[in-house]
Structure formats: structure tokens, C-alpha cells
Amino acid sequence: MGLFLLCFFFGFGILIQGGYLLMVFSRTAWYIRGLKKKGIQYPEEGVTVLVTARNKFQHLKVLIPKLFEQDYPKFDVMIVNDQSSDRTKRLLEDLMIQYPKLRSVTIKYTPKHVTAKKFAITLGIKVAKNDVILLTDADCLPTSNQWIRQMTAPVREEGKTFALGFSGYQEKEDALNRWIQFETILRALFYFSFGLWKSPFMGTGKNLCYRKSFFMDVRGFKGFWDLEGGDDSVFVNTYATGTNTKVIIDPSAITLSAPKENWKEYLQNERRLLHAERYFSVEDKRKMGLYGVSHALYWIGGIGLLLYFGVGLQWEYFLVVLTLMSFRSVLLLAIFKSASKNLQGNVPKMRALSNDLLYLAYFWVLGSISYQAKNTK
């Protein structure tokens, strides 16, 4: 009976894992960017870059000058100063003299039953001058001067409602950073691949574009005002469809931000994200859940069979299992390497194989913590 279960676990796991790697994630990994049609002139519609910030003086000091290096003729920058107690207000006053297209609005308090981030985004969108809104965070930096042009093109030129972009993290030489790099690419493989499959279900507010008019028409974050974190993902999950959304896979259209400095901060942030994912549609939760379950069964069954056949000196069966696991490992490495190059133009150090095994614990432990704390605000 034990052998049967191990074989079932491994067989089911490797079958589903193979399906995700070959049929889903491969869409992002081996995506080929099409050439832009020549001879078609689109109006360069105005864009508002929206950033909400609370006590982000040091980040804004770097971000704002970087934004005004963008190669796009019609844009302004709106900074929502959300109850900052540092030197943010003074910095903005000084920089608005230097950059006439820089605007700011200050929030002195947040209404009850509304999370601060959602209130700040909503206020910023309401006072934005332009209909095309491009969101990022204060700790993010665009990696090229084509960021605005590339990220807003689907909304401006193709009539899309959403444009979903990639946001990565700066590299550091430590285990946490390598895990963050791995998990970021894995998460991107989900939402970019399903987006290419005309089934988008999430995005990141660090690099996201949509129209002000659409946001106001659907009354913004109505229905999840009090949700702590995940405002971007739940908003996209609620309203993005295969016809109104486009994913942008281009290293010139990405942002990079500083990663969390310790595991405690990282896990707190991840718990908020996982809590937000509870508000996804049932179908979309199945997309991620099936991967997590099959991943666990693959590793439990695979390691169990290797031990069983190894102890029993049944080397022919041992080699069959080892070969299948090796094939999956090679495929995983190839997909992560190719996807990283497609998304951000380089391959950060991430120890994909060892972190893939660590994901077994991450998915279940953090998921359990999130479930137990689901009523905690």
C-alpha cells in the first residue's frame, strides 16, 4: 500500500508539473516579442505616473529625478504624500520647483474601515490630470527611459484596460535574496503565462497601467476597501479579462526595487499577499493551488520512491525515478533561465533547484499561517 501511494503521488505530481512547465510556463520562458507595425502613428496621450509614499524621503529623492529622464513627451508625476513624518513634504516642495510636471497631494488622515494604501491610490487617481494611469512604488526604479512608453502602449494604442508589467528586485549576496529572486520569477511565470493564455488573474502595483475612467466607473476598490495589502492583485483579478488585458514582456518596461532585508519582514509581506489571494476567483485559486499540490506530491513521492528502491537495491526502478526527476529539474532550470532573460534581461542568482525544494515548505507553512490569521486585520 505504501509503494502504491508513493507511485500515485509521484505519477500525479510529475504529470501535472510537466503540464505546467511545458504548456503554461513555457509561454513566458520562450515568448518571442513581435515587431511593432511601422507606418502607424498613434497619438501620444498624456500619462500620469502615480506613486503613493509614507516616509519614503530617501527613495523619492532618487525616484523622482529618474522618472523625469523618461523618453515620453506628455506625462506628469503625482506623488501622494500619505501622512509622512519625515522630510518628504519639504523634498516635494523643492522638487516641484525644479520639475514643473511634478505634482503632489497630502493626506492628513485615513477614514475608518479603509486601508491607507487604497485610500491614497484612490485620491491620487481622482486628482490625476491624465486618463492613463501608470502605478509604481516609491522604492521602485524604472530600468530604462522607455518605461512609460512601453508600459502604457497597450492602453494608449490598443484600447486595452490593463497593462501588466514585471517588477523585480535588486540582487544581493545572501540566501534571502536568492529565495526572493526565485519566488519573484515563479510568481511572474504564473501571471504572465496565464495572461498570454488570455486568462489574466493578477498583477503588481509596482508596475501596472490602467485608465482613470475605468477605475472611476467600477468605483475603484469597492468590495475590498478593508483588505490589508493586495489592492493591485485583487483589483486586476476582479476586472481583468483575456480581451481587455495585455502583459508586457520586455526588459525596457520593468522596474526594480530593494528587497526585504530580513526573513521577518519578507514573511509578513508574503502573508499579506497570500491573504489577498483568498479573494481571487475559485478558478484562479485552483491555478495556483493545483501547482502547489502537485509540487508537494512530486517531491514526497519522488524522494519516497528513491529511498524505497534504494534501500531495496532495486536499482532499475531507482534509475527510472531518478531520470524522470532529473528531466524535470533540467526543464525547470531552462524555463527559469529563459524566463528571467525575457522578463528582465538577465539571470539573477537564485539557486532554482534548491529553492524549488524549499518551496515545498514555503507553500504549505506560509499558507497555513495565512489561513489561521485570515480574520486578523
Regions found by a protein language model. Give the residues of each.
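Cell-envelope/extracellular polymer assembly enzymes that use nucleotide-activated donors
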Residues: E45-T48, D76
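Short aromatic/hydrophobic "clamp" motif used to bind/position activated sugar donors
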Residues: I133
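Catalytic donor/gating beta->alpha subdomain of glycosyltransferases that bind UDP-sugars
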Residues: V155-R187, S213-M216, K222-M288
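Long helical/loop segments within the catalytic core of UDP-sugar-dependent glycosyltransferases
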Residues: R103-A116, A120, G124, N130, ...
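A conserved acidic beta->alpha catalytic loop
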Residues: P73, N81-L91, C140-L141
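Short, acidic, metal-binding catalytic loop of nucleotide-sugar glycosyltransferases
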Residues: P65-K74
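N-terminal membrane-anchoring/stem segments of glycan-assembly enzymes
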Residues: M1-Q41
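Membrane-embedded multi-pass helical conduit in multi-pass membrane proteins
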Residues: G292-K374
